[in-house]
């Protein structure tokens, strides 16, 4: 239905309406808050994938990543570990390594997964690629104002069978992967493959139950199994000044994947970056390794959890 950017606009606008109703304040339509009495514009409802897709498609074939395993939680319970880091120190650390905050966190997560895999799989020849999926907000590359889903992805990866690498080398790998693919030409070719499938005359007349089976098969082949987890960073959240006194904190929590038990959502509110690590298994092994990596980088980290 939408992506992280669209969901944030919805939450901001909903919060503005609540505050207006409860406290009688007037919230201007700015900084991602929509005019609540206005009709949605056609641009907000646009399918920007269909509008900007080109004729050239990129291959969706990728190597399968290593998947973390553990004891499944009962009754659908989800464990959440939130790591809170001073935003200025996180930015400074990223700058020292010549990367963005998102790239630094991606490299740190990859380092944590590499260390965990080394514990679980002692023989390096039996290890699998470590890949972290980074969503890309396509509105920054194309002139779109849609509130529907308009995000693609980039998946930095490293194969531990090729030998050890330093953290700085990991940062460089992530940085150059982002630099190579985070452009409108590469992104257009990526999502053009999906749009071409949607436009297929065969799929248009195919019964829904068959279409669902086919879509699941494709997703299992080129979807979640191709990465260890998703790390999505919404960045710094801004609100109209009149709303600020009523908001203590913001978190960004994404659901776990069907075939991988971990995911990670990041958002910065005020002077703190909130890194929300969610999982559907009991063992907090990845979070422990991730915390250790951040600690080694000299970052002060506070941790809270809902573990039972």
Label every model-predicted segment.
Residues 1-21, 267-286:
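Histidine-centered acyl-transfer/condensation active-site motif
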Residues 2, 15-23, 95, 109-121, ...:
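Hydrophobic/aromatic-lined pockets within catalytic cores
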Residues 2, 101, 122-126:
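Short, surface-exposed helix-loop/turn micro-motifs enriched in polar/charged residues
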Residues 2-92, 298-308:
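Non-catalytic, low-complexity flexible loops and terminal extensions
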Residues 6-17, 90, 101-114, 174, ...:
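Structural preference for long, well-ordered alpha-helical segments in enzyme cores
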Residues 82, 91, 115-308:
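Acyl-thioester-dependent acyl-group transfer interface
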